[in-house]
């Protein structure tokens, strides 16, 4: 809708990442020169037969001395990703586990720590499981992800087709074009939400195995 595109445009304008150019060299100021109605029409035209530009891959340093791959979409693709995010996020937020805190609105590591304290005090839970999935973002299975999005209740075929196109967008790195079979680039606006969709089943399973599993002892306080 026009309202969704305008809201996405306003959110993109407030993002520092919008001043980082993708493969076409354009940033948010290149969009801001157009009247808002022109921006809306351009987005609508792109969505009719959506084909994203290549994602520019770069690397940033991590705290442990290693590097993390970062995918930078073109500014117009960032705007379209924001439009899709605003459609998906309210639906998915209602389905995510209450203990999930990563990459979610109004949640942080502080929320996770507070939840841990509460579970220790009220539920007598004292174990922490530390899991690190190697190369997680780069190894997400596209077909399974689309099925998980469908299971979330997002079943509009046009929206799903746009997400598929985003996932299959070519990656440009050092003049080499890579056609991804798996993964979603870190740096994309939609990637954090997609990663949470992938992990949602795991969140609920972990809770069923520890937090909510019936115990032979009834704890009282």
Give residue spans per PLM region.
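Conserved pre-motif C helix in the palm subdomain of viral-like polymerases
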Residues: 67-96, 182-209
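Conserved small/polar residues in nucleotide/adenosyl-binding loops
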Residues: 220-221
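Non-catalytic, polymerase-adjacent accessory regions of viral genome-replication enzymes
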Residues: 1-37
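Reverse-transcriptase-like RNA-dependent polymerase core
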Residues: 42-66, 75, 79-87, 114-122, ...
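A short, contiguous, amphipathic alpha-helix enriched in charged residues
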Residues: 32-44, 150-154, 194-212
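Short, glycine/acidic-rich hinge or "gate" loops at secondary-structure transitions
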Residues: 96-104, 211-216
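Conserved short loop/turn motifs at secondary-structure junctions
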Residues: 25-31, 100-106, 132-137, 182
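Conserved catalytic palm subdomain of right-hand nucleotidyl-transferase polymerases, strongest
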Residues: 18-27, 71, 110-149
